[in-house]
């Protein structure tokens, strides 16, 4: 099955819009004793001039709301002088017209999601299950403040590039059987979880070529790069034993190895045990208490 969604949104604020394309694919099949399920999703989004929020100087709603009731909003249209500089006296709030027509921000996002699962039904009691998943996010954000903007008098441009990737792999063996009055279920498996995030931020100040919004138009530029990587390797198992649908015993054990902890002290194990007694099985069928259990 394949679906496509096309979303277009033109904001009530001039110079603002959003477009989003979503592609979805889902397929499954059986090949003998093997069942396969796969899904994929791709989302592409482009946004022009996201609104500022909170107490930002560029929050248009806040700036209009805090105007005196005697202030004519028509006066705001005179937002620049003859030299195209900021024409305002308030250093704490940006004229909405200036923010709309002189400042800008743009973003693009590409997101990929993949999920796959295969189940091998070896026999009626035993099966193997493998699962893979991945999520890749690529986000680019450009924020521009024209020269003479309050707080950015020399001009400002920042380009941020985010590359976030996550992978998950799991393999499970599942067994269930019944012997007389006993029910038995067991699970044994392992998992690998990986994160790889990279961020690059380029900041430019002191704009010299006002007509060209680009890094080359600025005198000063700086580069900041950050990365975050993590991997967790896990093994785990669970056992459940039941007797006559009356008594149940459960035990689990899991061990994780984290790449972010010191070598030699990066493994942690946590077991669990529980038991339950379904006393309602000893009672005659009653509408008053159809099911009761101590755990």
Language-model regions: role of each:
Residues 11-16, 22-111, 129-233, 260-262, ...:
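Surface-exposed loop/interface segments of Gram-negative outer-membrane beta-barrel transport/assembly proteins
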Residues 110, 267-268:
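Aromatic- and histidine-enriched alpha-helix N-cap/loop-to-helix transition segments
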Residues 1, 26, 115-117, 121, ...:
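Outer-membrane beta-barrel architecture
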Residues 30-33, 120-124, 177-180, 242-245, ...:
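Outer-membrane beta-barrel strand-turn architecture
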Residues 23-25, 130, 169, 233-239, ...:
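Extended, hydrophobic alpha-helical segments in both membrane/secreted and soluble proteins
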Residues 66, 245-247:
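Short, charged, low-hydrophobicity "junction" segments
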Residues 4-10, 249-258:
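Transmembrane beta-strand segments that form the barrel wall of outer-membrane beta-barrel proteins
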């Amino acid at each position: 099955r394949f679906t496509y969604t096309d979303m277009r949104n033109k904001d009530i604020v001039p110079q603002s819009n959003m477009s989003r394309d979503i592609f979805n694919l889902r397929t499954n099949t059986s090949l003998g004793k093997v069942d396969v399920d796969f899904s994929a999703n791709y989302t592409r989004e482009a946004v022009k001039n996201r609104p500022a929020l909170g107490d930002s100087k560029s929050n248009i709603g806040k700036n209009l709301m805090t105007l005196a009731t005697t202030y004519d909003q028509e006066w705001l249209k005179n937002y620049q002088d003859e030299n195209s500089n900021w024409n305002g006296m308030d250093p704490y709030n940006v004229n909405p017209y200036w923010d709309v027509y002189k400042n800008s921000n743009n973003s693009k996002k590409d997101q990929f999601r993949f999920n796959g699962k295969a189940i091998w039904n070896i026999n009626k009691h035993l099966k193997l299950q493998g699962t893979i998943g991945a999520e890749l996010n690529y986000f680019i954000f450009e924020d521009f403040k024209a020269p003479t903007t309050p707080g950015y008098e020399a001009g400002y441009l920042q380009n941020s590039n985010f590359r976030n990737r996550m992978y998950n792999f799991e393999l499970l063996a599942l067994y269930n059987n019944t012997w007389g009055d006993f029910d038995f279920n067991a699970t044994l498996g392992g998992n690998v979880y990986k994160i790889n995030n990279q961020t690059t931020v380029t900041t430019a100040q002191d704009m010299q070529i006002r007509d060209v919004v680009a890094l080359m138009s600025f005198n000063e530029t700086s580069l900041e790069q950050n990365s975050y990587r993590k991997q967790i390797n896990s093994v785990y198992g669970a056992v459940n034993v039941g007797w006559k649908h009356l008594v149940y015993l459960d035990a689990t054990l899991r061990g994780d190895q984290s790449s972010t902890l010191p070598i030699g002290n990066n493994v942690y194990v946590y077991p669990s045990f529980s038991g339950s007694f379904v006393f309602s099985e000893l009672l005659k069928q009653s509408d008053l208490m159809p099911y009761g259990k101590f755990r």
